[in-house]
Each structure stands twice: as structure tokens, then as C-alpha cells.
Amino acid sequence: MLYWMLETGRSLHSGKKYYQRYIFYMIQSKLLVSSVMKKIFMGLSGFFLITFLVLHVSLNMMSVLSENSYNAISHFMGYNPIVQFIGQPILAFGVFFHFIMGFVLELQNRRARPIAYAYNNGAANSSWSSRNMIISGLVILAYLGLHWYDLWFQELNYKFIVKKVPNSARYYGELRDKFANPLRVILYCCAFILLGFHLWHGFSSSMQSVGLSNKYSLALSKFGKAFAVGVPSAFVFIAVFHYFSQL
């Protein structure tokens, strides 16, 4: 009888340990899946914003190439209901979703490796851009807030508060007026230089998040670095061009 009780106790204890391990494994599995899904959504939102950057720099470059074309495209986008009431809200959501997901993942990584952060020599194991994504992201988000206030809110005032008559020839002149201010040009250029550092790591990270980096890693890495340099440089060129062409 004593032997049976001892064996039963051992079995119950073993079963309890097994159950605890099972629960721990399930929690870890769910956390892993959750983390992977967050990274995938982070990568997809990054792709969305990269696509927007291509469209945005293409439109802005038209201001250098053709005043009439820039006015025509800007007027179309400014009064197209699909762009205004569907495209812009989606863009705003994409921006905030991307940054919120980035902050959440950064906090998760810091909690998961508290000791490693204390002893890890970051400069020896990763680039400056990868170690400071959250800093560059915060600065870019702050700049976007100013940029939206400067452009989007002024546009809302023009259309819905003052209710001025639509003028398709006003956009080029307004752009030139903004870039006549040297402080504005400096802030604009600094923001896009920082965006370049953000993209230097962010482009390849987005590829990795959606599973494209393994098969095309070398080509995508080269393209990502070219994109990180080329697109911000184009934005900087546009600002500098309009400033110096007015001196």
C-alpha cells in the first residue's frame, strides 16, 4: 500500500511537471507566433511606405522638370475624392501603424535580452542605423507632424475653411515659397538624410520579415542600399534646387 502511494505520488508529480512544461511551451509558441506576425505586419507596412516614397519623390521631381506638369498632378491629387478621402487616411494609418509596431517590437527585444544589452558591444556587431532605428523613427515622425501641419492643414484651410476658388496654377508657386526659407530647407534636408539611415537598415529588414531575403539576399541588399541613398538624395536635391534657384 505504501509502495502504491509513493508511485502514485511520483506519477502525479511527474504529470504536474509535464503539464507545467506543456503550458510553458504553449505560451512560448504563442509569443513566438505573435512576434513573427508583428514582424510580418511591420515589413508589409514598410513596403507600403516605401511605395509611397517612390510616388512622392516622383511627384516632387516634376517640380524640377516641369512647372505645368507639377501643377496639373498636384491639382488632380488635391481634388480627387479617392486620393483625399481614401488614400490619405490609409497613408496616415500606415505611418502610425508602422511606427507603433516598431516601438512595440523594440520594447519586446529589449525585454527579451536585458543582459545581452548590457554586455553586447553594439558597434562591433551591427550598424549605427540598425541600433538606432527607434531614434531615427521618432525624429522622422516628429518631422512628419510638422510636414503635415505645414502642407495638409494649410490645404484644408484653403479648401474647407476659407473656401477659396480652386486654382490649378498655385502649387508650384507655393512650393517655391516654402523652399525660399533656408531654415525650412535645412530641416527638410536633415530629415531626409535621417530617413536614408532609417531605410539603410529598414529596407533589408522588411525583406527579411516577409521571407524574401534568403533567396535574393545579395541583390535585395544592394537594391535596398541604393534605394536608401537614392530616394532621400532626390528629396534633398529638390529642396536645394528650389532654394538656390531663387537666390
Language-model segments: residues:
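Membrane-embedded alpha-helical bundles that constitute the cytochrome b-like, heme-associated redox core
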Residues: Y18-L247
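Polybasic, lysine-rich low-complexity intrinsically disordered segments
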Residues: T8, K16-K17
